[in-house]
């Protein structure tokens, strides 16, 4: 059986000068990791400095470019009951992409029943093409990557 990670779209490359998506998700994840950045969707000097600081903390190449290694280190697994900026990042993805549950899903940082239903619906849609995707309501590495890379988008 092919693993989900082998067939899911690659992580996007995000760098200074990029705007809106997936910069807002990046900024929410940086905040969840303790970096003081404004979530404005603009990858400016403050976001660049936070990315470089994060890369240095994690022993990654310090280049200010958010690619596969930085995304993988940055994501935080969230599930029903989770709260905070990582959850806001998930909710932002659903709203931006107008995915199932997205239009009515508040970006409030609370992983409640509506967010859980949206995540499970997304995982179900992925599962149809990639049977190894679990439909468990947990946003771990595979679900994060599918969301951020734009699978099933718009």
Regions found by a protein language model. Give the residues of each.
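Cell-envelope/ECM-targeting effectors and their regulatory/trafficking segments
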Residues: 1-154
């Amino acid at each position: 059986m092919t693993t989900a990670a082998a067939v899911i779209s690659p992580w996007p490359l995000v760098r200074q000068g990029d705007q809106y998506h997936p910069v807002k998700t990046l900024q929410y994840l940086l905040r969840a990791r303790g970096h003081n950045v404004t979530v404005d969707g603009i990858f400016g000097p403050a976001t660049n400095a936070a990315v470089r600081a994060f890369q240095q903390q994690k022993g990654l190449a310090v280049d200010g470019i958010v690619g596969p290694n930085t995304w993988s280190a940055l994501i935080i697994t969230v599930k029903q009951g989770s709260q905070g900026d990582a959850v806001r990042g998930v909710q932002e993805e659903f709203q931006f992409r107008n995915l199932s549950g997205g239009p009515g899903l508040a970006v409030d940082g609370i992983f409640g029943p509506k967010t859980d239903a949206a995540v499970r619906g997304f995982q179900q849609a992925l599962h149809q093409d990639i049977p190894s995707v679990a439909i468990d309501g947990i946003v771990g590495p595979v679900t994060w990557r599918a969301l951020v890379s734009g699978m099933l988008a718009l």
